[in-house]
Amino acid sequence: MLESLTLQPIALVNGTVNLPGSKSVSNRALLLAALAEGTTQLNNVLDSDDIRHMLNALQALGVNFRLSADRTCCEVDGLGGKLVAEQPLSLFLGNAGTAMRPLAAVLCLGNSDIVLTGEPRMKERPIGHLVDALRQGGAQIDYLEQENYPPLRLRGGFRGGELTVDGRVSSQFLTALLMTAPLAEQDTTIRIMGDLVSKPYIDITLHLMKAFGIDVGHENYQIFHIKGGQTYRSPGTYLVEGDASSASYFLAAAAIKGGTVRVTGIGKKSVQGDTKFADVLEKMGAKVTWGDDYIECSRGELQGIDMDMNHIPDAAMTIATTALFATGPTTIRNIYNWRVKETDRLTAMATELRKVGAEVEEGEDYIRVVPPVQLTAADIGTYDDHRMAMCFSLVALSDTPVTILDPKCTAKTFPDYFEQFARLSQLA
């Protein structure tokens, strides 16, 4: 029997949340620190399953690091070049896309023999476009089970050169190539085919590479030029900003049942595109205030919206449950890549929204939500997807309780989410 957590109806949310570190930034920073020359102190690192998978992999590859007791500060001794394994090695990466994709690329630089594998869901998450691009650059990669999916066997050989990669499935493929290319022997030119999804995540990658001493030129995110034979250099210390996707639940809760909630660790200067989530809440009618290192949200009369949310794919999920509290329908468009995340999020979201009484239209790349007059108490399936669990906690901001099945799945990015949510909540 799955564990479950029942949230009783909440009358008001109010308070401040210091956000855990960003998953996207933490795993990129850990990998660059490992590749860099010098020692890097990373502060406000996220402590979650996805990060532990990256740390375990780096340790197996001979990287020395020291973690503080609460695992949020990590001092990494960089190797000043590529990661190599002296003997054949198998690395288990759970369901961490932010570890699997970049490591698949970076580990093609040497001539090590390395297998990358993970949980059953990881074996359903496509990686073929990345493998194709790496092979264009000379990498030797074999699929061990299903063509185009992990597990992979890597045997090095990547030298750079002219690469093309499909931009339509995941921006992590491009992120992986960008982080790898400076260490290749040759200069690299990467051409993007199709529209690049989740562009703001590429900005995170470019920002981090710059922090570690490497500039990348690009032509309108369609062609990227990277010089080969470079070395990443430690910035000394690097502060990981708060996780903007994680902020979305607290900001949405305030929009629905504030009070006022302030999230700290992100703000005007944030490198994460998911901070744009606050603009969507504002469009719906919430009151939003921005500081340099905080965003604050207060309740407003929420109206449904119809919007392309390709630029905030993770935080957009939170809009789907916020829509339950708006007047009129909400349509979230251009989110095909929800289908290749931790689960097929479009189908999962449609299924669970219907359980609480919403009328839902699920398209190939959009979802339309018509809120019910009265929400229905339901047991919410979470599909081993941290964001499903967190999104549906918002249902309790009504006069109806909600039961979340397998609440511990939030450990992927936010182990103490439900404690933080409860801390802000005053029960009806």
UniProtKB/Swiss-Prot annotation:
<feature type="binding site">
    <location>
        <position position="23"/>
    </location>
    <ligand>
        <name>phosphoenolpyruvate</name>
    </ligand>
</feature>
<feature type="binding site">
    <location>
        <position position="24"/>
    </location>
    <ligand>
        <name>3-phosphoshikimate</name>
    </ligand>
</feature>
<feature type="binding site">
    <location>
        <position position="23"/>
    </location>
    <ligand>
        <name>3-phosphoshikimate</name>
    </ligand>
</feature>
<dbReference type="GO" id="GO:0005737">
    <property type="term" value="C:cytoplasm"/>
</dbReference>
<keyword id="KW-0808">Transferase</keyword>
<keyword id="KW-0963">Cytoplasm</keyword>
<dbReference type="GO" id="GO:0009423">
    <property type="term" value="P:chorismate biosynthetic process"/>
</dbReference>
<feature type="binding site">
    <location>
        <position position="172"/>
    </location>
    <ligand>
        <name>phosphoenolpyruvate</name>
    </ligand>
</feature>
<dbReference type="InterPro" id="IPR036968">
    <property type="entry name" value="Enolpyruvate_Tfrase_sf"/>
</dbReference>
<feature type="binding site">
    <location>
        <position position="345"/>
    </location>
    <ligand>
        <name>phosphoenolpyruvate</name>
    </ligand>
</feature>
<keyword id="KW-0028">Amino-acid biosynthesis</keyword>
<feature type="active site" description="Proton acceptor">
    <location>
        <position position="314"/>
    </location>
</feature>
<feature type="binding site">
    <location>
        <position position="314"/>
    </location>
    <ligand>
        <name>3-phosphoshikimate</name>
    </ligand>
</feature>
<keyword id="KW-0057">Aromatic amino acid biosynthesis</keyword>
<dbReference type="GO" id="GO:0003866">
    <property type="term" value="F:3-phosphoshikimate 1-carboxyvinyltransferase activity"/>
</dbReference>
<dbReference type="InterPro" id="IPR023193">
    <property type="entry name" value="EPSP_synthase_CS"/>
</dbReference>
<protein>
    <recommendedName>
        <fullName>3-phosphoshikimate 1-carboxyvinyltransferase</fullName>
        <ecNumber>2.5.1.19</ecNumber>
    </recommendedName>
</protein>
<feature type="binding site">
    <location>
        <position position="97"/>
    </location>
    <ligand>
        <name>phosphoenolpyruvate</name>
    </ligand>
</feature>
<dbReference type="InterPro" id="IPR013792">
    <property type="entry name" value="RNA3'P_cycl/enolpyr_Trfase_a/b"/>
</dbReference>
<feature type="binding site">
    <location>
        <position position="125"/>
    </location>
    <ligand>
        <name>phosphoenolpyruvate</name>
    </ligand>
</feature>
<feature type="binding site">
    <location>
        <position position="337"/>
    </location>
    <ligand>
        <name>3-phosphoshikimate</name>
    </ligand>
</feature>
<dbReference type="InterPro" id="IPR001986">
    <property type="entry name" value="Enolpyruvate_Tfrase_dom"/>
</dbReference>
<dbReference type="InterPro" id="IPR006264">
    <property type="entry name" value="EPSP_synthase"/>
</dbReference>
<comment type="pathway">
    <text>Metabolic intermediate biosynthesis; chorismate biosynthesis; chorismate from D-erythrose 4-phosphate and phosphoenolpyruvate: step 6/7.</text>
</comment>
<dbReference type="GO" id="GO:0008652">
    <property type="term" value="P:amino acid biosynthetic process"/>
</dbReference>
<feature type="binding site">
    <location>
        <position position="172"/>
    </location>
    <ligand>
        <name>3-phosphoshikimate</name>
    </ligand>
</feature>
<feature type="binding site">
    <location>
        <position position="341"/>
    </location>
    <ligand>
        <name>3-phosphoshikimate</name>
    </ligand>
</feature>
<feature type="binding site">
    <location>
        <position position="171"/>
    </location>
    <ligand>
        <name>3-phosphoshikimate</name>
    </ligand>
</feature>
<comment type="subunit">
    <text>Monomer.</text>
</comment>
<comment type="function">
    <text>Catalyzes the transfer of the enolpyruvyl moiety of phosphoenolpyruvate (PEP) to the 5-hydroxyl of shikimate-3-phosphate (S3P) to produce enolpyruvyl shikimate-3-phosphate and inorganic phosphate.</text>
</comment>
<feature type="binding site">
    <location>
        <position position="170"/>
    </location>
    <ligand>
        <name>3-phosphoshikimate</name>
    </ligand>
</feature>
<dbReference type="GO" id="GO:0009073">
    <property type="term" value="P:aromatic amino acid family biosynthetic process"/>
</dbReference>
<comment type="similarity">
    <text>Belongs to the EPSP synthase family.</text>
</comment>
<feature type="binding site">
    <location>
        <position position="198"/>
    </location>
    <ligand>
        <name>3-phosphoshikimate</name>
    </ligand>
</feature>
<feature type="binding site">
    <location>
        <position position="412"/>
    </location>
    <ligand>
        <name>phosphoenolpyruvate</name>
    </ligand>
</feature>
<dbReference type="Pfam" id="PF00275">
    <property type="entry name" value="EPSP_synthase"/>
</dbReference>
<feature type="binding site">
    <location>
        <position position="28"/>
    </location>
    <ligand>
        <name>3-phosphoshikimate</name>
    </ligand>
</feature>
<feature type="binding site">
    <location>
        <position position="387"/>
    </location>
    <ligand>
        <name>phosphoenolpyruvate</name>
    </ligand>
</feature>
